């Protein structure tokens, strides 16, 4: 099996380094946060992953892609092979040079999304402190650390790591992907771009930038992407649109759908291409036709830009996984679903094997509505109808 991530990519995750942003690094022993990027990219941990993939074996850390591919879906691995933003690696080699770097400059986010947790969003920690009873119930009944103290929070690169990247990785890197948290929600992201522009060892005109963003803001505390992006080869933006319209505002607490649309149109002249991704949970399962039609309307707002749309899926917490809805509910959703390029993988996933014996989504909806003091009756009426059947 080939994977551009395993042979080209470096990511800083909770506790240390990994070859992919989805990789579960539980069995890594030589790639902890005390190491430098240049020390880990060809160590025993990383080489073992490449060797296993070359032998058509799934590394333990690749469980997300394994689940997707065994369900007949595309995966992060298969989609990486379609990525032409950087040159192809030598898949026969165990040692590599990093061409694709992922940086998470903050764990802060200005949204509170229902599928996220404290490991990726520091704002949830205070929410948990303010709601200890709900925090405990989410953890105990759903195995969901939504607002619990983080045990595996994102590690943010410190000065030591950043200096090593500037010395040993960035001068030859071809692509940098910023995620988070929300990447536009920290001065460190903007400062990193400016430092690269100012560094004579780095030719930013040869470096592409990719963002995973909720597109809620374009500037932060005096910094703006508008003056920085023109110095780079090109910019691609993956917009996390987990729902549209009222469903978006309901699922993504503190989000405003119209503001996101305005920002997309405003920044479009600086962007080479957009990818709109709906991280699909049981909340979204009732709205896939509407989401698709709304995505088509967004494409009309930026007609001169290359725009793609796709789904990905929530597996954890299991109660939010679409496969764990009631069987009759899934059958009804499939009956009403218009299958197209956007919804086809959703239909496949919906037919997948259950991972919970008993559905628990209704209970989770009620608990999260209580937590966020909002009712699906007003913003997600199809979810309301479902939980009151």
Show which residues each predicted segment covers.
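Distinct, well-ordered alpha-helical segments
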Residues: 188-194, 220-228, 287-291
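Accessory C-terminal segments flanking Radical SAM cores
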Residues: 1-81, 313-389
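Core AdoMet radical
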Residues: 98-108, 117-159, 171-189, 199-221, ...
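A Trp-anchored, charged/polar loop motif used as the substrate-binding/catalytic surface
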Residues: 43, 86-92, 155-167
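Recognition helices and adjacent regulatory flanks at domain boundaries
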Residues: 64-100, 109-111, 131-132
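Short functional micro-motifs and their immediate structural scaffolds
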Residues: 70, 114, 121
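Acidic (Asp/Glu)-rich catalytic clusters
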Residues: 226-233, 268, 299
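Catalytic cores of alpha/beta
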Residues: 282-298
């Amino acid at each position: 099996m080939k994977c551009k991530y395993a042979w080209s990519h470096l990511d800083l995750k909770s506790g240390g380094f990994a070859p992919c942003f989805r990789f579960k690094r539980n069995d890594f022993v030589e790639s902890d946060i005390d190491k430098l990027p240049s020390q880990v990219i060809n160590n025993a941990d990383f080489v073992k992953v490449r060797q296993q993939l070359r032998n058509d074996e799934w590394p333990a850390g690749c469980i997300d892609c394994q689940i997707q591919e065994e369900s007949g879906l595309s995966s992060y691995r298969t989609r990486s092979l379609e990525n032409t933003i950087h040159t192809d690696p030598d898949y026969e080699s165990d040692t590599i040079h990093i061409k694709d770097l992922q940086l998470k400059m903050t764990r802060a986010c200005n949204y509170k999304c229902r599928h996220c947790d404290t490991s990726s969003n520091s704002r949830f920690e205070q929410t948990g402190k303010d709601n200890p009873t709900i925090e405990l119930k989410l953890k105990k009944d759903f195995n969901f650390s939504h607002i619990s103290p983080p045990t595996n929070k994102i590690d943010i690169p410190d000065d030591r790591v950043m200096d090593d990247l500037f010395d040993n990785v960035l001068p030859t890197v071809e692509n940098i992907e910023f995620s988070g948290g929300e990447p536009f929600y920290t001065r460190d992201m903007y400062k990193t771009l400016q430092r690269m522009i100012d560094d004579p060892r780095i030719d930013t005109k040869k470096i592409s930038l990719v963002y995973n963003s909720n597109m809620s803001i374009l500037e932060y505390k005096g910094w703006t992407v508008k003056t920085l992006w023109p110095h780079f080869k090109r910019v691609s933006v993956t917009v996390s649109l987990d729902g549209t319209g009222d469903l978006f505002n309901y699922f993504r607490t503190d989000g405003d759908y119209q503001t996101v649309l305005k920002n997309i149109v405003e920044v479009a002249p600086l962007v080479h291409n957009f990818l709109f991704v709906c991280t699909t949970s049981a909340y979204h399962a009732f709205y896939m036709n509407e989401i698709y039609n709304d995505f088509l309307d967004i494409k009309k707002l930026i007609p001169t830009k290359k725009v793609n749309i796709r789904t990905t899926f929530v597996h954890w917490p299991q109660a939010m996984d679409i496969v764990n809805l009631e069987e009759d509910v899934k059958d009804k959703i499939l009956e009403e679903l218009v299958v197209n390029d956007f919804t086809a993988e959703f239909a496949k996933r919906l037919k997948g094997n259950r991972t919970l014996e008993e559905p628990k989504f209704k209970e989770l909806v009620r608990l999260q509505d209580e937590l966020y003091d909002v009712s699906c009756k007003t913003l997600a009426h199809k979810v309301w109808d479902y939980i009151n059947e």
